[in-house]
Amino acid sequence: MIVHPIDYRYGTPEMKRIWSEDSKIKRMVRVEMALLRALAKKGYLSEEEAKEAKKKAYSVTPERVKEIEAEIKHDIMALVKAITEATGCRWVHFGATSNDIIDTATALQLRDSLKILEVKIKRLAKVLADKALEYKDVVCLGRTHGQAALPTTYGFRFALWAAEVARHYIRLQQMKDRLLVGQMSGAVGTQAAFGKDGFEIEEEVMRLLNLKPALISSQIIPRDSYCEYLEFLANLAATLEKIALNFRLLQRAEVGELMEKFEAKQVGSSTMPHKRNPIDCENVCGLARVVRGFVEPQHQSAILWEERDLTNSSAERITLVESTVLADHILTKMIKVVSSVSLNLENIRRNLEMQRGLNLSEAVMIEMTKRGVGRQEAHEILRQAAMRAYENNSSLLDELLKDERVMKYFKEDELREILKPENYLGTARERVERVVRWVNEVLK
């Protein structure tokens, strides 16, 4: 019986395959076989025995493991018994503890997951950077506190998001060495069962798996690395939600500047035929909150008794799997949304013009200061003019033209030029181009 939405609604097939039960067991078998090969290299068993065991070990099924676990109440020992049953090899699991297998197999899953996330983060950063260049001269209304602010450009907005996503790409690279480690260190981390062979056996196992050995561990690898990973996913999810949220704000009927793609046969509402709801962005916002919610239980799972207890185990079966699958889901969704987004240039211009020049009050204030008026005095003159414009439902220009304190410094045509949004963009264009160059360099 399927009860979890990840099974039937959320997540990509490629990521769900990595975290499936069958995949987990196959990776744990792979770790056990790497241990046998390392033991063979040290002479505990013959190379031939290790090779023969490997041929048969992958016939172990989740169903058989569950049958044994139902009887003995221990999942890893059930796996060990199933492998021993399939291979006939008496050296299976020699010197190892359960989490030597679990944590090392998890590192393999995380490595494969990071490969997928890395490609998609790169893709999203590139799409955002391309949009930034495409829209670098599309002047729009900037908003702070939800209210009209200075003009900006859509290219600037997309460049801001592109830079943020590119920083996540950098963080992912930096995290790999700390996260992608395995262990073969025994019950309390001392490698006692291996004697003086411990370092060499562990290093050989990790070489075969293309992992690095943990510098030190108890019965388990310290969970600070898992905490860092979930914090990374939470941080990524926050960025994705921020982009999606702003897309939703800009799609509101009274704004109408931007629109996520709406398919020809797509239905927006079961009762309102006209609706074109931003469901992809809403989906991202909802699931991003779930991803961030896994950070706290993972932090709690890092706090264990002495050499370890089992309180982390049940939680991590959920936190690692669901956070990874859902983060990949919303990342995939945002690539789709950003790639196909469209701008309504008419509405963008309309929203600028609706401000009647009030959002350019700073531009006039700055120019007045340059022409000899004290900055604070100029601020008050412009504030008073703006308040009159609100009260009279007039334009800022109308009020300024009637104010002698202003007009002794300006001609009318000068004010008109100052109050053109495209004339007050500072280094917006250059900053967009700088960001795009940097993003492309990061993603090389």
From Swiss-Prot:
PROSITE patterns for this protein: FUMARATE_LYASES
Pathway annotation from the record: Purine metabolism; AMP biosynthesis via de novo pathway; AMP from IMP: step 2/2; Purine metabolism; IMP biosynthesis via de novo pathway; 5-amino-1-(5-phospho-D-ribosyl)imidazole-4-carboxamide from 5-amino-1-(5-phospho-D-ribosyl)imidazole-4-carboxylate: step 2/2
UniProt xrefs under InterPro entries: AdenyloSucc_lyase_C (IPR019468), Fumarase/histidase_N (IPR024083), Fumarate_lyase_CS (IPR020557), Fumarate_lyase_fam (IPR000362), Fumarate_lyase_N (IPR022761), L-Aspartase-like (IPR008948), Pur_lyase (IPR004769)
GO CC terms: cytosol
UniProt feature coiled coil, ranges: none
Location of the active site: H145, S269
Reactions mediated catalytically: N(6)-(1,2-dicarboxyethyl)-AMP = fumarate + AMP; (2S)-2-[5-amino-1-(5-phospho-beta-D-ribosyl)imidazole-4-carboxamido]succinate = 5-amino-1-(5-phospho-beta-D-ribosyl)imidazole-4-carboxamide + fumarate
Protein residues bound to N(6)-(1,2-dicarboxyethyl)-AMP: 9-10, 73-75, 97-98, 219, 270, 275-277, 283, 314-318
CDD domains in alphabetical order: Adenylsuccinate_lyase_1
Keywords: Lyase, Purine biosynthesis
Principal EC category: lyase
SUPFAM superfamilies associated with the record: L-aspartase-like
Enzyme Commission code(s) on record: 4.3.2.2
Protein family: Belongs to the lyase 1 family. Adenylosuccinate lyase subfamily.
Assembly and binders: Homotetramer. Residues from neighboring subunits contribute catalytic and substrate-binding residues to each active site.
Function in brief: Catalyzes two reactions in de novo purine nucleotide biosynthesis. Catalyzes the breakdown of 5-aminoimidazole- (N-succinylocarboxamide) ribotide (SAICAR or 2-[5-amino-1-(5-phospho-beta-D-ribosyl)imidazole-4-carboxamido]succinate) to 5-aminoimidazole-4-carboxamide ribotide (AICAR or 5-amino-1-(5-phospho-beta-D-ribosyl)imidazole-4-carboxamide) and fumarate, and of adenylosuccinate (ADS or N(6)-(1,2-dicarboxyethyl)-AMP) to adenosine monophosphate (AMP) and fumarate.
NCBIfam families with a match to the protein in the record: purB
Name recorded for this polypeptide: Adenylosuccinate lyase
Source species: Archaeoglobus fulgidus (strain ATCC 49558 / DSM 4304 / JCM 9628 / NBRC 100126 / VC-16)
Gene responsible for this protein: purB
